[in-house]
Protein backbone atom coordinates (compact mmCIF):
# COMPACT_ATOMS: atom_id res chain seq x y z
CA UNK A 1 0.00 0.00 0.00
CA UNK A 2 1.17 3.53 -0.75
CA UNK A 3 0.68 6.33 1.76
CA UNK A 4 -0.70 9.63 0.51
CA UNK A 5 -1.82 13.02 1.77
CA UNK A 6 -4.36 15.51 0.48
CA UNK A 7 -3.29 19.11 -0.03
CA UNK A 8 -6.33 21.34 -0.11
CA UNK A 9 -5.86 22.60 3.45
CA UNK A 10 -2.62 24.32 2.44
CA UNK A 11 -4.60 26.37 -0.09
CA UNK A 12 -8.03 26.85 1.54
CA UNK A 13 -8.67 28.73 4.78
CA UNK A 14 -10.54 26.73 7.42
CA UNK A 15 -11.39 29.98 9.24
CA UNK A 16 -12.89 31.66 6.16
CA UNK A 17 -15.40 29.14 4.83
CA UNK A 18 -12.63 27.37 2.88
CA UNK A 19 -11.98 30.31 0.59
CA UNK A 20 -8.43 30.53 -0.81
CA UNK A 21 -5.89 31.65 1.78
CA UNK A 22 -4.47 34.07 -0.79
CA UNK A 23 -3.94 34.30 -4.54
CA UNK A 24 -0.60 32.45 -4.48
CA UNK A 25 -2.22 29.11 -5.19
CA UNK A 26 0.76 27.53 -6.91
CA UNK A 27 3.17 28.61 -4.18
CA UNK A 28 0.88 27.16 -1.53
CA UNK A 29 0.55 23.92 -3.50
CA UNK A 30 4.33 23.62 -3.74
CA UNK A 31 4.65 24.22 0.00
CA UNK A 32 2.25 21.32 0.54
CA UNK A 33 4.35 19.09 -1.71
CA UNK A 34 7.56 20.11 0.04
CA UNK A 35 6.18 19.36 3.49
CA UNK A 36 4.56 15.98 2.81
CA UNK A 37 7.58 14.83 0.82
CA UNK A 38 9.78 15.73 3.79
CA UNK A 39 7.58 13.50 5.97
CA UNK A 40 7.85 10.49 3.68
CA UNK A 41 4.46 10.49 1.98
CA UNK A 42 4.43 8.94 -1.49
CA UNK A 43 1.28 10.14 -3.25
CA UNK A 44 -0.85 13.28 -3.20
CA UNK A 45 -4.37 14.33 -4.11
CA UNK A 46 -6.31 17.58 -4.29
CA UNK A 47 -9.73 18.99 -5.01
CA UNK A 48 -10.59 19.50 -8.65
CA UNK A 49 -9.91 23.23 -8.58
CA UNK A 50 -6.18 22.49 -8.61
CA UNK A 51 -6.70 21.47 -12.25
CA UNK A 52 -8.19 24.89 -12.94
CA UNK A 53 -5.19 26.64 -11.37
CA UNK A 54 -2.86 24.67 -13.65
CA UNK A 55 -5.08 24.47 -16.74
CA UNK A 56 -2.55 26.47 -18.77
CA UNK A 57 0.55 24.97 -17.16
CA UNK A 58 0.33 21.17 -17.23
CA UNK A 59 4.08 20.78 -17.53
CA UNK A 60 4.58 23.09 -14.57
CA UNK A 61 2.23 20.92 -12.52
CA UNK A 62 4.01 17.71 -13.46
CA UNK A 63 7.42 19.22 -12.84
CA UNK A 64 6.64 20.55 -9.37
CA UNK A 65 5.15 17.20 -8.27
CA UNK A 66 8.15 15.31 -9.64
CA UNK A 67 10.52 17.80 -7.99
CA UNK A 68 9.50 16.39 -4.61
CA UNK A 69 9.47 12.73 -5.72
CA UNK A 70 5.71 12.46 -5.33
CA UNK A 71 2.96 10.97 -7.48
CA UNK A 72 -0.29 12.89 -8.01
CA UNK A 73 -3.01 10.23 -8.05
CA UNK A 74 -6.46 11.56 -7.12
CA UNK A 75 -8.64 14.48 -8.16
CA UNK A 76 -11.60 15.07 -5.82
CA UNK A 77 -14.79 15.89 -7.71
CA UNK A 78 -17.96 17.46 -6.27
CA UNK A 79 -21.42 16.90 -7.69
CA UNK A 80 -23.72 19.90 -8.12
CA UNK A 81 -27.49 20.04 -8.59
CA UNK A 82 -27.00 19.75 -12.36
CA UNK A 83 -26.05 16.20 -13.47
CA UNK A 84 -25.52 17.21 -17.11
CA UNK A 85 -23.09 19.92 -16.06
CA UNK A 86 -21.34 17.49 -13.72
CA UNK A 87 -20.81 14.99 -16.52
CA UNK A 88 -19.26 17.65 -18.76
CA UNK A 89 -17.07 18.84 -15.89
CA UNK A 90 -15.94 15.27 -15.30
CA UNK A 91 -14.86 15.06 -18.94
CA UNK A 92 -12.77 18.19 -18.51
CA UNK A 93 -11.10 16.98 -15.35
CA UNK A 94 -10.43 13.55 -16.81
CA UNK A 95 -8.45 15.20 -19.58
CA UNK A 96 -6.33 16.88 -16.91
CA UNK A 97 -5.93 13.58 -15.08
CA UNK A 98 -4.84 11.86 -18.26
CA UNK A 99 -2.22 14.54 -18.87
CA UNK A 100 -0.74 14.14 -15.37
CA UNK A 101 -1.17 10.33 -15.15
CA UNK A 102 -3.64 10.30 -12.23
CA UNK A 103 -5.74 7.19 -11.64
CA UNK A 104 -8.49 7.95 -9.10
CA UNK A 105 -11.42 10.35 -9.05
CA UNK A 106 -13.28 10.74 -5.79
CA UNK A 107 -16.92 11.80 -6.08
CA UNK A 108 -19.05 13.50 -3.42
CA UNK A 109 -22.66 14.60 -3.23
CA UNK A 110 -23.82 18.16 -2.64
CA UNK A 111 -23.09 19.17 0.96
CA UNK A 112 -25.48 21.23 3.05
CA UNK A 113 -24.29 23.52 5.87
CA UNK A 114 -27.59 24.21 7.64
CA UNK A 115 -29.16 22.11 10.36
CA UNK A 116 -30.31 19.43 10.75
CA UNK A 117 -27.04 17.91 9.59
CA UNK A 118 -28.32 14.32 9.58
CA UNK A 119 -31.43 13.95 7.46
CA UNK A 120 -33.73 11.11 6.41
CA UNK A 121 -32.62 9.02 3.46
CA UNK A 122 -33.49 10.72 0.19
CA UNK A 123 -33.91 7.73 -2.10
CA UNK A 124 -34.57 9.81 -5.21
CA UNK A 125 -31.40 11.84 -4.70
CA UNK A 126 -29.27 8.77 -4.06
CA UNK A 127 -30.57 7.02 -7.16
CA UNK A 128 -29.86 10.16 -9.17
CA UNK A 129 -26.28 10.14 -7.87
CA UNK A 130 -26.05 6.45 -8.72
CA UNK A 131 -27.08 7.05 -12.33
CA UNK A 132 -24.64 9.94 -12.67
CA UNK A 133 -21.88 7.89 -11.04
CA UNK A 134 -22.38 5.04 -13.50
CA UNK A 135 -22.06 7.49 -16.40
CA UNK A 136 -18.95 9.12 -14.98
CA UNK A 137 -17.55 5.75 -13.92
CA UNK A 138 -17.94 4.35 -17.42
CA UNK A 139 -16.10 7.38 -18.77
CA UNK A 140 -13.42 7.05 -16.08
CA UNK A 141 -12.77 3.46 -17.07
CA UNK A 142 -12.02 4.61 -20.62
CA UNK A 143 -9.36 6.90 -19.13
CA UNK A 144 -7.88 4.23 -16.87
CA UNK A 145 -9.33 5.96 -13.79
CA UNK A 146 -11.30 4.50 -10.87
CA UNK A 147 -14.40 6.51 -9.95
CA UNK A 148 -14.85 6.28 -6.17
CA UNK A 149 -17.82 7.57 -4.19
CA UNK A 150 -16.80 9.22 -0.91
CA UNK A 151 -19.65 9.04 1.64
CA UNK A 152 -19.57 12.33 3.52
CA UNK A 153 -21.36 14.02 6.40
CA UNK A 154 -24.08 16.48 5.41
CA UNK A 155 -24.67 14.78 2.06
CA UNK A 156 -27.25 12.30 0.78
CA UNK A 157 -24.73 9.42 0.89
CA UNK A 158 -23.48 9.19 4.47
CA UNK A 159 -25.18 6.57 6.68
CA UNK A 160 -24.96 2.80 6.26
CA UNK A 161 -28.47 2.69 4.80
CA UNK A 162 -27.56 5.39 2.29
CA UNK A 163 -24.25 3.78 1.34
CA UNK A 164 -25.96 0.42 0.80
CA UNK A 165 -28.67 1.95 -1.40
CA UNK A 166 -26.08 3.77 -3.50
CA UNK A 167 -23.80 0.75 -3.89
CA UNK A 168 -26.70 -1.57 -4.75
CA UNK A 169 -27.65 0.73 -7.61
CA UNK A 170 -24.22 1.31 -9.15
CA UNK A 171 -22.31 -0.94 -11.50
CA UNK A 172 -19.31 -2.54 -9.74
CA UNK A 173 -17.46 -2.47 -13.04
CA UNK A 174 -17.55 1.33 -13.08
CA UNK A 175 -18.08 2.61 -9.53
CA UNK A 176 -15.96 1.98 -6.44
CA UNK A 177 -16.05 3.16 -2.85
CA UNK A 178 -13.71 5.52 -1.02
CA UNK A 179 -14.19 4.86 2.68
CA UNK A 180 -13.29 7.78 4.93
CA UNK A 181 -12.65 6.40 8.40
CA UNK A 182 -13.74 9.55 10.26
CA UNK A 183 -16.92 10.21 8.28
CA UNK A 184 -17.76 6.52 8.62
CA UNK A 185 -17.37 6.69 12.39
CA UNK A 186 -19.33 9.95 12.58
CA UNK A 187 -22.18 8.13 10.82
CA UNK A 188 -22.19 5.47 13.54
CA UNK A 189 -20.55 2.83 11.33
CA UNK A 190 -17.69 0.59 12.45
CA UNK A 191 -14.94 1.29 9.91
CA UNK A 192 -13.37 -2.21 9.86
CA UNK A 193 -16.81 -3.79 9.40
CA UNK A 194 -17.58 -1.52 6.45
CA UNK A 195 -14.23 -2.43 4.89
CA UNK A 196 -15.00 -6.11 5.42
CA UNK A 197 -18.40 -5.78 3.75
CA UNK A 198 -17.29 -3.75 0.74
CA UNK A 199 -13.68 -4.88 0.46
CA UNK A 200 -13.80 -5.90 -3.18
CA UNK A 201 -15.42 -2.61 -4.20
CA UNK A 202 -13.05 -0.33 -2.33
CA UNK A 203 -10.99 1.68 -4.79
CA UNK A 204 -9.42 4.26 -2.49
CA UNK A 205 -9.17 5.09 1.22
CA UNK A 206 -9.22 8.28 3.26
CA UNK A 207 -7.72 7.96 6.73
CA UNK A 208 -8.45 10.38 9.53
CA UNK A 209 -9.32 9.98 13.18
CA UNK A 210 -12.19 11.40 15.23
CA UNK A 211 -12.66 12.33 18.87
CA UNK A 212 -15.42 10.07 20.29
CA UNK A 213 -16.82 12.82 22.56
CA UNK A 214 -20.13 13.73 20.93
CA UNK A 215 -20.53 16.76 23.20
CA UNK A 216 -17.69 18.50 21.38
CA UNK A 217 -18.32 20.87 18.47
CA UNK A 218 -22.02 20.15 18.23
CA UNK A 219 -22.31 23.25 16.04
CA UNK A 220 -20.14 21.49 13.41
CA UNK A 221 -19.28 17.87 14.30
CA UNK A 222 -16.60 17.57 11.62
CA UNK A 223 -14.39 19.72 13.85
CA UNK A 224 -13.97 16.56 15.95
CA UNK A 225 -11.72 15.08 13.25
CA UNK A 226 -8.15 14.45 14.44
CA UNK A 227 -4.73 13.26 13.23
CA UNK A 228 -4.30 9.49 13.23
CA UNK A 229 -3.95 7.98 16.69
CA UNK A 230 -5.62 10.95 18.40
CA UNK A 231 -9.15 9.57 18.34
CA UNK A 232 -11.12 6.32 18.43
CA UNK A 233 -10.83 4.79 14.94
CA UNK A 234 -9.55 1.19 14.89
CA UNK A 235 -6.94 1.64 12.16
CA UNK A 236 -5.30 -1.73 12.82
CA UNK A 237 -8.65 -3.35 12.14
CA UNK A 238 -9.13 -1.25 9.00
CA UNK A 239 -5.73 -2.25 7.60
CA UNK A 240 -6.25 -5.92 8.48
CA UNK A 241 -9.59 -5.98 6.67
CA UNK A 242 -8.08 -4.22 3.66
CA UNK A 243 -5.36 -6.86 3.50
CA UNK A 244 -7.93 -9.63 3.80
CA UNK A 245 -9.77 -8.10 0.83
CA UNK A 246 -6.58 -7.97 -1.23
CA UNK A 247 -6.51 -4.16 -1.25
CA UNK A 248 -3.09 -2.87 -2.26
CA UNK A 249 -3.91 0.67 -3.32
CA UNK A 250 -3.53 4.07 -1.64
CA UNK A 251 -4.15 5.03 1.97
CA UNK A 252 -4.57 8.80 1.79
CA UNK A 253 -4.50 10.84 4.99
CA UNK A 254 -6.66 13.94 5.23
CA UNK A 255 -7.53 16.40 7.99
CA UNK A 256 -9.93 19.31 7.65
CA UNK A 257 -9.10 21.22 10.85
CA UNK A 258 -5.58 21.49 12.26
CA UNK A 259 -4.84 21.34 16.02
CA UNK A 260 -1.59 23.23 15.33
CA UNK A 261 -0.73 23.39 11.63
CA UNK A 262 -0.82 21.25 8.49
CA UNK A 263 2.76 20.04 8.84
CA UNK A 264 2.29 18.92 12.44
CA UNK A 265 -0.93 17.06 11.62
CA UNK A 266 0.73 15.29 8.70
CA UNK A 267 3.73 14.45 10.88
CA UNK A 268 1.62 12.94 13.68
CA UNK A 269 -0.29 10.81 11.18
CA UNK A 270 2.81 9.65 9.30
CA UNK A 271 4.53 8.62 12.53
CA UNK A 272 1.42 6.70 13.58
CA UNK A 273 1.24 4.89 10.24
CA UNK A 274 4.91 3.93 10.51
CA UNK A 275 5.17 3.12 14.22
CA UNK A 276 1.75 1.58 14.87
CA UNK A 277 0.57 0.25 11.51
CA UNK A 278 4.01 -0.70 10.22
CA UNK A 279 3.52 1.01 6.87
Question: Model regions: which residues?
Answer:
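N-terminal pre-domain/capping segments
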Residues: 1-104, 123, 141, 172, ...
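Residues at the N-termini of beta-strands
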Residues: 43, 104, 204, 249-250
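Active-site acidic/histidine proton-transfer and metal-coordination neighborhood
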Residues: 67-71, 82-177, 236, 263
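Conserved radical SAM core fold
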Residues: 10-13, 79-82, 111-116, 211-214
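Gly/Pro-rich active-site loop or hairpin
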Residues: 14-26, 117-120, 185-248, 257-260, ...
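Acidic-and-aromatic substrate-binding clefts and catalytic sites of carbohydrate-active enzymes
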Residues: 46-58, 78-88, 113-117, 153-159, ...
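Non-cysteine beta-strand/loop elements that form the S-adenosyl-L-methionine
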Residues: 4-8, 102-109, 201-212
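Acidic/histidine-rich catalytic cores of soluble enzymes
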Residues: 43-44, 73, 134-232
